[in-house]
Amino acid sequence: MQIQPHPSGALLLLLLSNLLMWENVASVPRCIMENGGCQKVLNYLFNMTSTISESFNTLSSETLNDFYTEFDPHQTFQNRPAMTCHTSSRSIPNNKRKAERMEPAALLNVIIRMLASWKNLLYHVENNMANLDGTPYAIISKVKLIDRQIKKLTKNLQDIKTILSQVHPELKEKENYPVWSGEPYVQKSKRRTQLFGLHSLFFCLYSDAEKVSDYVNILRNKIVPNE
């Protein structure tokens, strides 16, 4: 039985082979290959990425609301600020206007960096909610879905980065990723302190998911406009 290659993988390989033929081009600000080349492959990748990022945003919002319903019925945490999110940084734009002013290569790295900062999300949730009173299983199930979405988003964006790095060498540089700083809170034996840490985790996740969804669409408009 002959195994057929996955369509997205075949398209990506075809594109990369084409890119190798014109990698000596000094500067290509936008992917402009015609007749089914770069534009179509990037548009295909962005279609998938946009859909997943919207689902990521929706699920993160639902997870935060589930947390409020299950563990904060009196709005104790909703009426007080969460701890500073671990992804808060001068290099990460905090609104769409700032993101729109960024160069595509820089914005792509920002999105990948934000997603990588949540690579241990499932570990934190499973480890720190298992002993809480209540029924956190619905929340944990959604976090498992979110974890898979983060991995898919990262894979798609890395594929886009592979393509664009042919004309944007700076994209090949490795990034350092911030890690969540709330672990000391959720490891406390006091339930209220644990819940404060988990509230901050889910609030920051929701905030970042919203940004990722917005920034993916901004990036798409910069790289494959009018598609």
UniProtKB/Swiss-Prot annotation:
Gene Ontology biological-process annotations: cell surface receptor signaling pathway; female pregnancy; mammary gland development; positive regulation of lactation; positive regulation of receptor signaling pathway via JAK-STAT; response to nutrient levels
Subcellular location(s) per record: Secreted
The UniProt keywords, alphabetically, are: Disulfide bond, Glycoprotein, Hormone, Secreted, Signal
Give disulfide pairs as residue numbers. C85-C204
Name of the featured protein: Prolactin-5A1
Tissues expressed in: Expressed specifically in placenta. Highly expressed in invasive trophoblast cells lining the central placental vessel.
| Similarity field | Belongs to the somatotropin/prolactin family.
* Any one GO molecular-function label of the UniProt entry: hormone activity
Where would one find the signal peptide in this protein?
1-27
Glycan attachment positions: N47
Q: Which domain of life is it from?
A: Eukaryota
Q: What is the lineage of its organism?
A: Eukaryota, Metazoa, Chordata, Craniata, Vertebrata
